[in-house]
Amino acid sequence: PAEEARAENAVRVLTEIMQAPDKGIPENLLQKAEAVVVVPDLVKAGLVLGGSRGKGLMAVRAPDGTWTNPSFVTMTGGSIGFQAGVQGIDVVLVFRTRRGADSVVNGKFTLGADASVAAGPVGRTASALTDAQLKAEIYSYSRARGLFAGIALDGSVLAIDHDANQAVYGADMTPRRIFSGAVGDVPGPLVVFRDALEEHSAR
C-alpha cells in the first residue's frame, strides 16, 4: 500500500539524516523534541500552482517519554526555493514545543506564521546556536540529492492526512486516538518508524 511505502521512505530519510557523519540531527536535540515530522520527497507543485506538496508522518512524545504511533500528514504550499535541477527534497521537522504539535492536530498549521521555524543545527551535539535557532519553535532539516540544503519552509502548511490515517488505522480514526495509543493493529513499517525515533533519541 502507498501508505506503508510512505512510512518506509520516512524511516529511510530519518535514518540517513541521523547517520550523516557530523552533519546529522544532534541526538540531544531529538531527545528534547516534543514532535517530529518526516516528509520524504517534497516536490514542486508546478510553476502554475507554485509552492510544493508532500506527504509524510508525524509522531509526538507521549507523557511517558516514548514516541507515539505516527499519524500521516501532508505538507503543501510555501514558496520553497528549490535549487535549479532539484525536483524534490526530504524534510525533517523537529518541534521543540508541544504547542506546535497540538496546532497541527487541531487544524492547519502554517510554518513561520503559527510558529517560528529555522534551519536546525547539525553535528553530534547542538552547542553553538544562532539567535534565530534559539528563538525558533521548530527546527527544519532539508536534504536534496543526499546533501543538506538549508531551504526556507516559511509559508508551508502542515495538515493531518485523514484519508491515509483511516486507510491504515481504520475508519473514524483521529490523530488524537492515534497519539494516545488507542489503535489496534499497526502495520510493520509504522512500528519501524516509531522504533527508529526511539533509537535515535533514547533519553
PLM features per residue range, with description:
Residues 1-203:
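Small-residue-enriched, tightly packed secondary-structure blocks
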